[in-house]
Every structure is written in C-alpha cells, then in structure tokens.
C-alpha cells in the first residue's frame, strides 16, 4: 500500500479535510486528517492496519504487546495487535502524564511495539516511550498509519509508517496570506484524554 493509497482511504472516509486547522501541536495547517472518520469504519481500519502489520515483521520480529496512547493509539493498536497475534494495551493521561492503568502490565522480556494513528511532532509517541520505560518490557519500535512529519519527527524509537506525507504547517504568527483569511478550527483530541 502506497502513501497515495492510504490518502485515498482517508478521502473515501471523508477524512481528508481542507481549511485552516489548529493541530494538536499548536501549529497551523491547511490540511487535517480526521482519523476518527477512518477508524469509525472497521473495514477501513482493518485494511490499513493489516497492511501496516505486514511491514512490521521483517523489521521487528515477534511482538508480544502493542501499546498506544489514548485516544489516537487505541484502535490502531488493537487492530495491529490482532494481526500480529499480540495483546493490545493503552496509556491514558493522569494529571497530564501518560500511565498504563486498568490492570495493564508487561512482563520482563516481552517485546513491545508502540502504535499511533498519525505522527506529527512525535510528542505522544515520546510520552508513551517514557511511560513504557517504567515497565519491564523491551520497546522494539513504533508504528503509525501516517507520519505527517515526512520522517522528521523524533519519536524516541525506530518508526515504521504505512504512509509518509509532508503537508506544510506553520507557526500561528507566521501564516501564509491564504490561511490568514480563514477562521481556524481545532478538530484534534489532545487535552481531551
């Protein structure tokens, strides 16, 4: 599956939006990937995650646990775990810090893959790496459906994406004239979970 194929799935779901958007990082963009619309469709979720899982075995070998941050890593983490024959767990925010709760555990020696839907700056990924550092498993790498950074984000481990895109984004005080004319909306989820 190519990056163009992945974007076609987002278009099919009505999830490739154009306008003026405030990204979770605070940066601005004329393109937003509303992944909730994709992951509301089990057929599309399975299609994307099955293709991503097929890429992972050669790089990471056997995976015991797939761990992702809430909210964005829950569905792709579950779907990847299903295709990899692994368990799926997720971290959630407690007092602003990601923690693994709800009885989730990782045993010494278990190989852990971090899963996320879309990576832009890598912040949620790095926070998940930090939360996993408190547990005895071994983080072998990470996976995401779309790497919006075009491979530039520092995620704290090796990252394999199903697609890489490089949509321009801007600091709020350095917008191009065409975005300055459009009211900004914030469709993301950071701060909600």
From Swiss-Prot:
CDD domains recorded: PRTases_typeI (cd06223)
E.C. number: 2.4.2.10
Pfam families: Pribosyltran
Disulfide bridge partners, by residue number: none
Pathway entry: Pyrimidine metabolism; UMP biosynthesis via de novo pathway; UMP from orotate: step 1/2
Enzyme class of the recorded protein, top EC level: transferase
Molecular function as annotated in GO: magnesium ion binding; orotate phosphoribosyltransferase activity
Alphabetical keyword list: Glycosyltransferase, Magnesium, Pyrimidine biosynthesis, Transferase
Keyword Transferase attributed: yes
A single GO BP: 'de novo' UMP biosynthetic process
Cofactor(s) required for function per UniProt: Mg(2+)
Catalytic activity: orotidine 5'-phosphate + diphosphate = orotate + 5-phospho-alpha-D-ribose 1-diphosphate
Residues binding 5-phospho-alpha-D-ribose 1-diphosphate: 116-124
Annotated binding of orotate, by residue: 120, 148
Glycosyltransferase in keyword set: yes
Family of the protein in this entry: Belongs to the purine/pyrimidine phosphoribosyltransferase family. PyrE subfamily.
The protein's role, per its UniProt record: Catalyzes the transfer of a ribosyl phosphate group from 5-phosphoribose 1-diphosphate to orotate, leading to the formation of orotidine monophosphate (OMP).
Protein name, per record: Orotate phosphoribosyltransferase
Organism: Hyphomonas neptunium (strain ATCC 15444)
Lineage of source species: Bacteria, Pseudomonadati, Pseudomonadota, Alphaproteobacteria, Hyphomonadales
Gene name, Swiss-Prot/TrEMBL: pyrE
């Amino acid at each position: 599956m190519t990056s163009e194929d992945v974007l076609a799935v987002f278009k099919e779901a009505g999830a490739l939006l154009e306008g003026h958007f405030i990204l979770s990082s605070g940066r601005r963009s004329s393109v937003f990937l509303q992944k909730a619309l994709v992951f509301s469709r089990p057929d599309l979720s399975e299609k994307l995650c099955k293709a991503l899982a097929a890429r992972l075995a050669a790089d990471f070998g056997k995976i015991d646990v797939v761990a992702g941050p809430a909210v964005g890593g829950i569905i792709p983490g579950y779907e990847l775990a299903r295709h990899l024959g692994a368990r799926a767990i997720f971290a959630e925010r407690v007092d602003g810090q990601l923690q693994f709760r709800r009885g989730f555990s990782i045993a010494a020696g278990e190989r852990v893959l971090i899963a996320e839907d879309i990576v832009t700056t890598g912040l949620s990924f790095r926070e998940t790496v930090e939360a996993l550092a408190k547990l005895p498993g071994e983080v072998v790498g990470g996976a995401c459906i779309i790497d919006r950074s075009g491979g530039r984000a520092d995620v704290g481990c090796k990252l394999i994406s199903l697609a890489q895109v490089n949509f321009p984004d801007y600091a709020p005080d350095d917008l191009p004239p065409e975005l300055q004319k459009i009211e900004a909306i914030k469709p993301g989820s950071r701060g909600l979970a």
